[in-house]
Amino acid sequence: MFEDNHPDFQNEVKEIWTSDIETKVKDFSTRVSVTNTPFIIYISGIDTYGSITTVSRSDVNMIVTVNPNTKKILLTSIPRDYYVTLANMQKKDKLTHSGIAGPENTVKTMAKFLGTDINYYARVNFTSLVTMVDALGGITVNVDRDFSAGGYTYKLGLQQMNGKEALAYSRERHSFADGDNVRVKHQQDVLMAML
């Protein structure tokens, strides 16, 4: 993706050292019987490439409420710039900053803000979104308007997207007067296309 915006990136940047870090992921889910009990999944999208364990802001904050009895799913997105009481500091700050203290802090912050249990969570970053969409063979999204972003052009109507196109589609906000609201809708469009 860097290469798309900086064609000389490979020639101008030299890798001098790399390190692999393994991190055990703590499971703090509140498990329920998903076949007959409604449950909530929190999806945190962090604004980085590479390892999913990278410390970063939580820019996508999506609540997926699943009711297996009615076979319905409700998507609710909370804007990253909402001021909420952060679980780790007990003071108000932007929701996006909760991610800096890790996914458990963000889940606890969201649960307190919404006044409900979060049964499961998933953390996604730029790399994992591209990988998932490509693993599906791409996705078909019903694009709601013509625009260009990240070197890609999106046309009104059904459009097939690979991982990089889906990422650029779900990140763009500067092309729209109501940018953050449109970006949230596009993020939901991408998730629904993946299901």
Identify the role of each PLM range:
Residues M1-L195:
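Non-catalytic, solvent-exposed segments at the cell envelope interface
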